[in-house]
A protein has these predicted regions:
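Acidic carboxylate diad motif detector
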Residues: 1-23
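Positively charged, helix-rich recognition surfaces that bind polyanionic ligands
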Residues: 25-166
Length: 166
């Protein structure tokens, strides 16, 4: 194993370290630190200002509320586009590797890079949307966010005539 040193003094960490874990992610490793800042959790107040989030495919999230503020709608086309482009590139890599042979496809460095890029783009999109939702809730003093249970989600989705892209 390689010895890696990380200077915690250089980072603005405030609080007591409770847990540290290393998580593999594609060809890299992530360091997750859990800190205790010593602050008590805020007490629950009267729940009166509620927003509801409806997750979807064409519309990634539709957000409404009970206080009369205009609703939010986040389109999901960007995620569909990212997935479509990733599937196209993976299909090409798979085709080149398995052309003229009976060997099964094995993940290569190039395939890992394509998947990593896709996952990073999706994570970036999700992070930005979550940040916008939280900021909107704070701005409008929303105290409760409700996200429905999505049992059987996407079962009635029309994925098209040909669906052979994993």
């Amino acid at each position: 194993l390689t010895k890696i040193k990380y200077s915690v003094k250089a980072t603005p960490i405030k609080g007591r370290l409770k847990e540290a874990s290393i998580v593999p992610y594609h060809n890299v490793f992530g360091l997750i630190l859990v800190l205790d800042d010593g602050k008590a959790m805020p007490e629950k107040k009267d729940i009166s200002r509620i927003c509801a989030i409806d997750m979807g495919i064409n519309n990634f999230a539709a957000i409404t509320n009970n206080i009369g503020v205009p609703s939010l709608l986040f389109k999901g086309g960007i995620i569909k586009s990212i997935n479509q482009y990733c599937n196209k590139r993976m299909r090409k890599i798979r085709s080149v590797q398995t052309a003229g042979t009976t060997n099964k496809f094995k993940m290569t460095d190039k395939a890992h890079k394509v998947c990593l890029k896709r996952n990073n783009q999706i994570a970036d999109f999700m992070s930005k949307i979550a940040n916008k939702i939280v900021n909107w809730c704070v701005q409008n003093n929303i105290d409760t966010i409700v996200i429905g249970k999505n049992t059987g989600w996407k079962t009635e989705t029309n994925l098209g005539k040909v669906n052979n892209q994993n």
